[in-house]
């Protein structure tokens, strides 16, 4: 979790100190479609763990027809398919033993859809692990990257990119997105275990 937060703040701060950059990763695409990576579990008996994530998608401001779902976790696939959501990728096997390479492979597919203009925004729905008795469903925007206004105050500090801004962002942002996704996977596994222990204690 500290690494997850540090990565998010570092990239936001870096971009805020980079002056005016025009890049698709920052401005978003023209498409109204939104890609959402949805992390749930493959098994039940975990209290409201899975249903709380599904509610982030079905009970929020999203328009069903505008969503492309990249699902990690069979329970999310079942629930969202039943409600008529478009599941473009089912990567539920990742949840059995998440690795960074698994995260990178799925992120590459989502980023490819973004760079091709098939989706204009990318979101991540997962369960934030606070402790074994407290887990919080979260929805965050991955792309376009949002610059932290607080970081723009230090106008005397500017970032210089080598060889140029575009190539640097093409290298940095995919790693940034993949790192956030992998961090979310790790938190989700811990949260699932905590939720299941609570459910068993309550049974």
Predicted segments with their positions:
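C-terminal beta-strand-loop-alpha-helix "lid" module of Rossmann-like NAD(P)-dependent dehydrogenases
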Residues: 1-202
């Amino acid at each position: 979790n500290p690494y997850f937060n540090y990565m998010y703040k570092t990239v936001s701060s870096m971009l805020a100190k980079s002056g005016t950059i025009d890049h698709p990763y920052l401005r978003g695409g023209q498409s109204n479609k939104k890609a959402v990576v949805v992390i749930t579990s493959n098994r039940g008996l975990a209290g409201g763990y899975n249903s709380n994530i599904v509610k982030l998608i079905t009970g929020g401001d999203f328009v069903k027809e505008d969503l492309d779902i990249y699902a990690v976790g069979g329970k999310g696939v079942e629930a969202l398919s039943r409600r008529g959501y478009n599941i473009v990728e089912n990567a539920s096997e990742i949840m059995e033993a998440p690795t960074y390479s698994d995260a990178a492979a799925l992120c590459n597919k989502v980023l490819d859809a973004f760079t091709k203009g098939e989706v204009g925004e990318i979101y991540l729905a997962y369960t934030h692990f606070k402790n074994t008795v407290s887990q919080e469903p979260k929805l965050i925007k991955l792309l376009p990257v949002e610059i932290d206004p607080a970081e723009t105050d230090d106008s005397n500090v500017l970032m210089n990119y080598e060889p140029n801004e575009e190539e640097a962002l093409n290298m940095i942002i995919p790693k940034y997105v993949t790192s956030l996704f992998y961090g979310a996977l790790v938190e989700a596994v811990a949260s699932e275990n905590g939720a299941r222990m609570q459910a068993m204690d309550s049974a």
